[in-house]
C-alpha cells in the first residue's frame, strides 16, 4: 500500500471514531453538572467537582475563569476532550447565562451535534428555544436529555408533547423514567428492553451503582411498587402504539430528537445516554467552503477558528485560538496558509484542551478541536489550510441590545487599557464599536446583556490591572448598513439614530427603540439595514 493510501485510510478510521457535540440549555437546567458526569463516565475526571456536598471537592472542571468560580455560572465556552470505548469525544461546553448567546452561537458553528438539556419541572424555557433556533438554522441533530427526574416535575408524556408542538420535532424516547421525585427508581432502556435501577451514591460524585433487570423478570416486583410498575407499563404501551419509530436519517436531518430521562446530579441515566448518543450521533460531516463541500476525509488539512481566549493561563498571559479541524490530518509544527492574510503560519505548540488544562498534542483529525498559540494572527472565523486555497463560511455577529462607553480614568494605564480592549475584542468577549466623532475616542461596548459589561470590567481589572468605568448610552438596537459608507452618504442626513463604526470599520446605526428604526426605514427606503453583521471574511480588523 502506498504512503498516500495509508494516510487516507488512517484519516478515514480516525473520523469514524470522532464525535463532537455542544450542550444547550437555559441557565440552571444542570448543564455544568451533566458535563461533569459525562467526563466522570468517560474517565476524564475521577470525582465530579460540581457537587458542593463537601468543601474539599474541586470547583466544576469546565468553569475555569475566576469570575465563573466566584458566581457559580458559566460565562465562556470551553472545550473538553475525552475518550470512551474507542471514541474520541469533543464536548463543547457553552455559556449557561443568557447574556452569552453570541459565544454560544460561535461554539455551535464548530459542533456536529447538539444536546438539548431540559429541566423536568420547567420544560422548554426561553434560552433553550432561542438556542434551538440557532441549531435548526445550522441543521444540527438534536438529542434531548430531560434532567432532574429525582425532583418533582411534569409528566414525561406532557414534556414529549411540548417538544413536538412547540419545536416541531418528532420525538423518540430512548429510555423511559420509572417514578419521579423521591419515588424515582431508574429508567427503562427501550434499546436493551431492560430496567436500570439506580442507587444514590456520594451525591453523584462517583459512577452510580446499578442493577439491570430484563422486562418480564419476576424480580421486578421486589424492586418496584405495584402502582409505579403499572404506570410504567401503561406509559410504555402508549409509546409503542402511538409514538414514532426511531429514524436516524430524520435525527441527522434535525427533524427528530431522541429523548433520554435522568438525573445528572445523582447519575441516573447518564451512562445510558452517553452510550446511545455515541451510536446515534452524526460523525464529522462535509462543510461548505469557497470551493464547495469539503469532506473530513479529504487528505489535506484545513480548519477554522471559532473562538479566541486571552489569559487562559494567568501565569503566562497567553492567547489561544480554538480551531475546529475540518479535513485531513493536523500535525505538530506543520506550516499552513492563513486564508484571510495569505501569510504562512507555523503551528508550533498545539494543545489538547481540557477547560484551562492543556497538554501538547502531536496530531488531530476532522471533528477534533485544538488550541493554537495566537500571537495576534488569528481572528474569529479565520480559515487555515494546506494545499489548494479554500475558505469556510465566516461566523456572523448578532445585534447587541445594550451600549456603553468604557472609560479609563487613569492615563498612566493607557497601554494596558488598549491591550485589554484589543485582546477582548479579538476574543469576541464583547462587540466593540467607536464613535465617528474623532473627539470621542473611548470604545463603545456593545453587549447582549448587562453581565457582559461586568465581565469586561472584571477581566480588565484582574487580567490587565485597569480599573474602568461605564457611561451608558440610551440605545437598544443596532443595524449594519449594507453597501457601507457610500450607501450612507447617498442617504444624506438621518434622524432618530447615531452612526458608529464596528470592529471592521463598517457603519452601524444605533437606535433608541423600534419606533426610531421603523421611522428611518420609512424615511430612507433605499437603505438596506441588517440585524446580523456581514461576515468579515478577507478583511482586517481596524
Swiss-Prot record:
Coiled-coil segments on the chain, per record: none
Single GO MF descriptor: translation release factor activity, codon nonspecific
Principal cellular location given in the protein's record: cytoplasm
Subcellular location: Cytoplasm
GO biological process, one term: regulation of translational termination
Gene3D superfamilies: P-loop containing nucleotide triphosphate hydrolases, Peptide chain release factor 3, domain III, Translation factors
Entry-linked InterPro entries: EF-G-like_DII, EFG_III/V, G_TR_CS, P-loop_NTPase, PrfC, RF3_C, RF3_dom_3_sf, RF3_GTP-bd
Keyword Nucleotide-binding: yes
Taxonomic superkingdom: Bacteria
A GO-annotated cellular component: cytosol
Binding site for GTP: 25-32, 93-97, 147-150
Keyword Protease: no
Domain tr-type G, chain residue ranges per copy: 16-285
Family statement drawn from the similarity comment of this UniProt entry: Belongs to the TRAFAC class translation factor GTPase superfamily. Classic translation factor GTPase family. PrfC subfamily.
Function: Increases the formation of ribosomal termination complexes and stimulates activities of RF-1 and RF-2. It binds guanine nucleotides and has strong preference for UGA stop codons. It may interact directly with the ribosome. The stimulation of RF-1 and RF-2 is significantly reduced by GTP and GDP, but not by GMP.
Name of this chain's protein: Peptide chain release factor 3
Organism: Crocosphaera subtropica (strain ATCC 51142 / BH68) (Cyanothece sp. (strain ATCC 51142))
